[in-house]
């Protein structure tokens, strides 16, 4: 990662830094007060109360340390410069749209968005509807729109099994994954694919890009995935119920545009399962999408990073979906 030029975006202003330091100082004063003045005296209240008090203070101290680390990480967001890629370098990409019980009308919007993604050679973009419910209407939609269809009779591994089934039937070096409702913008591939070539390219002093020589190539520098924000075109439950669509941001914005991007410096951005471009080599090395867990995306991302792959999160929304509109969908 040291060979990549990093641009720091959204540097905190003096006012913002002032409030951050106020928060850190106040938390420190609070924890010191809790440790020295509020832990129950065992001579008065007994050992059970004292031990419980110590555990509570320890939990609050850990929370404070985590908060301090969080403020430090978000002091500036770090995103690598996007390489300028020769047009003939753009590789084949498989686009997976995972669906379970979503309607054909909803899937139409996503497929339509995928078909309109800009790319130098459109023949290199292979779009597939991955349907683990094997529904005739979804297969008909795929035929109508001229995209591939992978149906499954019995999928006992949920979304992970669905995507792994698609991986076993395709071969492009890169895979873009989308949830059924996530509609990519025209620029999704043009904004994400170039980052996969950071190990092969270098930025010169004049801002142009050139291919690294054999001596300059670091064999250990491999790209794993590029995660873009999950953005929504309708208000979430909180915005809607508090009549605050124009006054408060979607709850996902803070995580995807601040926290996840802030994790770039530690090579720890989280794979969110959608709106992502992933290296097939990385997926093959970790055995595909993780199974046996309800957080297959999170675990898959960690496994890829543990294998030494470099991963980045971007703060630019390149796909937009449908926020949950009821409690059942949210859960």
What residue spans do the PLM features occupy?
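Short aromatic/hydrophobic "clamp" motif used to bind/position activated sugar donors
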Residues: 175
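Cell-envelope/extracellular polymer assembly enzymes that use nucleotide-activated donors
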Residues: 91-94, 126, 284, 299
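N-terminal membrane-anchoring/stem segments of glycan-assembly enzymes
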Residues: 1-89, 142
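The conserved acidic donor/metal-binding loop of glycosyltransferases
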Residues: 178-183
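A conserved acidic beta->alpha catalytic loop
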Residues: 120, 130-138, 154-155
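Active-site beta-to-alpha loop of glycosyltransferases that engages the nucleotide-sugar donor
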Residues: 90, 97-112, 133
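Long helical/loop segments within the catalytic core of UDP-sugar-dependent glycosyltransferases
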Residues: 151-168, 172, 186-294, 299, ...
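Short, acidic, metal-binding catalytic loop of nucleotide-sugar glycosyltransferases
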Residues: 110-124, 199
């Amino acid at each position: 990662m040291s060979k990549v030029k990093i641009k720091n975006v959204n540097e905190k202003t003096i006012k913002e830094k002032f409030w951050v330091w106020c928060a850190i100082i106040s938390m420190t004063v609070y924890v010191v007060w809790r440790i020295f003045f509020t832990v129950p005296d065992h001579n008065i209240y007994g050992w059970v109360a004292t031990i419980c008090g110590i555990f509570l203070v320890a939990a609050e101290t850990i929370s404070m340390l985590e908060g301090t680390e969080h403020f430090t990480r978000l002091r500036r967001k770090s995103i690598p410069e996007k390489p300028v890629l020769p047009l003939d370098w753009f590789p084949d990409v498989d686009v997976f749209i995972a669906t379970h019980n979503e309607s054909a009308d909803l899937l139409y919007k996503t497929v339509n968005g995928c078909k309109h993604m800009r790319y130098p050679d459109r023949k290199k973009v292979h779009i597939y509807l991955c349907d683990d419910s094997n529904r005739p209407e979804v297969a008909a939609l795929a035929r109508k729109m001229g995209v591939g269809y992978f149906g499954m009779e019995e999928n006992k591994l949920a979304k992970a099994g669905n995507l792994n089934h698609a991986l076993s039937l395709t071969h492009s070096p890169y895979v873009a994954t989308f949830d059924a409702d996530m509609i990519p913008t025209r620029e999704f591939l043009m904004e994400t694919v170039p980052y996969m070539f950071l190990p092969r390219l270098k930025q010169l002093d004049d801002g142009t890009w050139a291919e690294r020589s054999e001596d300059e190539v670091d064999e250990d520098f491999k790209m794993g995935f590029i995660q873009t924000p999950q953005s929504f075109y309708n208000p979430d439950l909180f915005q809607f119920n508090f009549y605050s669509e124009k006054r408060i941001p979607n709850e996902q914005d803070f995580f995807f545009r601040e926290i996840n991007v802030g994790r770039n410096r530690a090579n720890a951005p989280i794979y969110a399962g959608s709106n992502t471009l992933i290296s097939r080599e990385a997926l093959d090395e970790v055995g595909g999408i993780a199974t046996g867990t309800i957080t297959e995306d999170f675990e898959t991302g960690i496994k890829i990073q543990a294998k030494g792959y470099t991963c980045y999160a971007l703060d630019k929304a390149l796909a937009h979906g449908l926020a949950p509109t009821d409690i059942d969908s949210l859960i």
